[in-house]
From Swiss-Prot:
NCBIfam families: PRK00143.1, trmU. It catalyses: S-sulfanyl-L-cysteinyl-[protein] + uridine(34) in tRNA + AH2 + ATP = 2-thiouridine(34) in tRNA + L-cysteinyl-[protein] + A + AMP + diphosphate + H(+). Pfam families: tRNA_Me_trans (PF03054), tRNA_Me_trans_C (PF20258), tRNA_Me_trans_M (PF20259). Residues 161-163, 316-317 are annotated as: Interaction with tRNA. The lineage of its organism: Bacteria, Bacillati, Cyanobacteriota, Cyanophyceae, Synechococcales. This is tRNA-specific 2-thiouridylase MnmA. One of its GO terms (molecular function) is ATP binding. The gene is mnmA.
Amino acid sequence: MATSPYPLVAPEIAGSPSRPRIVAALSGGVDSSTVAAILHEQGYAVEGVTLWLMRGKGQCCTDGLVDAAAICEQLGIPHHIVDSRELFQANIVDYLVAGYADGITPLPCSQCNKLVKFGPLLTYARETLGISQIATGHYARVRFNSELGRYQLLRAVDRQKDQSYFLYDLSQEHLAHSLFPLGNYTKAQTRQIAARYGLVTANKPESQDLCLIETYGSMRNFLDQHLGQRPGEIVDTQGRVLGSHQGIHHYTVGQRKGLGIASSRPLYVVRIDAAMNRVVVGEREEATQAEAWVRQVNWVSTPAPDEPLAVEVQVRYRTPAVPATLIPESPERVKLQFAEPQFGVTPGQAAVWYHGDLLLGGGILERPSP
C-alpha cells in the first residue's frame, strides 16, 4: 500500500494483499476529485465514473464531464461516462414538476441519491466493471454496528457541510458498499488536500445544492419552462381574496418574500391548495404547527421502533435539528410531535431524525389536515 499522510479509507479493504478496486463517483467538483486522489495515493485501483444527467452547462452536465475526465487523466486512472439522462428525467425532472404542480415542495436530492446515483452506480460498478465498492464525495460517515448487524449513517464532522440529511433514504445494501472518505474532514481541509495534490479542480467554485439551478439559472425558471403560467387567487385563511398569482409552483409553505400582495402586517404562505389553484396566506402563527405526519419512512440505521421515541428532527436541510417525540403508526408512517411548535414545516420536504450524530431514519412530510 502506498504511503499517505491521510488516515486509511476503510483499512479492512486497504489491507488486502492485492490492490483493492473501487469506483470513485466523479461529478467534476473538488470534493469527488479529492476522494479519487486520496484513494489513488493509498494504493486503490481507482476507476472514475461520471453520470451524465442533463444537457447544458453546469457541474452536473457538460462542464462536470470535462472536469471529471481531466481529473482522471491527471491521476492516470480510467474514466467511464454513464448516460443517465432518461433515469434523471423520469425520477427527478418529472418528479419535481409533478410535485410542484400538486402544491408541494419536493426534495429531489434524496430521491436522486437513491434512484439515480447509488443504486444504478453500484449496478454499473458490479455488472460492467466487476467492482463491488464505490466512494463518493458526500460529507457523511458510515460505521458497522456489530450488535445490530447493521451499517449506520452518521453526520459528517463538518456540520456546516454535513449531507447525511440527503442520504436518509439509502438502503443497507447501499451503505455496505459505499465509502465517504470526506466524512472526517472539513471543507477547508478538503480544499487544502486538493491543493496539495495539485488537482485541476482545487479552486473550482462551490456548486449549487441543486444541479438544476446551474442549468436553468433558478428554480423559478425551471418550473416556468415546464409548467408555464397558471393564474389563481391568493387568499387568507378565511378565504378572502388578497391578490393573484401566476402559478402555485412559485410558492412554498413559510414563504414571506415575493407574495405580491399589500398588507399592514407580515404574511406567510400557510398552505397551497392545488385543487382550487390557491395560495393561502396568514400570520406567522398560522404557518406554525406542533406536529406533523411523515410517510414513506426509511429506517436506515436501526430497526423501526414499536414505541414512541425521543429524537432530534430536521425538517429542512439548512435548519437545525429540534427535539421531538416520534410516534410510529407503522414502519412506513410516523407522527412527529415537536417539543416546540415549528414554523414552515413544508409538505414534500424530508423530515430526518437523529440521536446525536446517528441518523436513524427519515421520510416525506405530509400535508397537514385543513
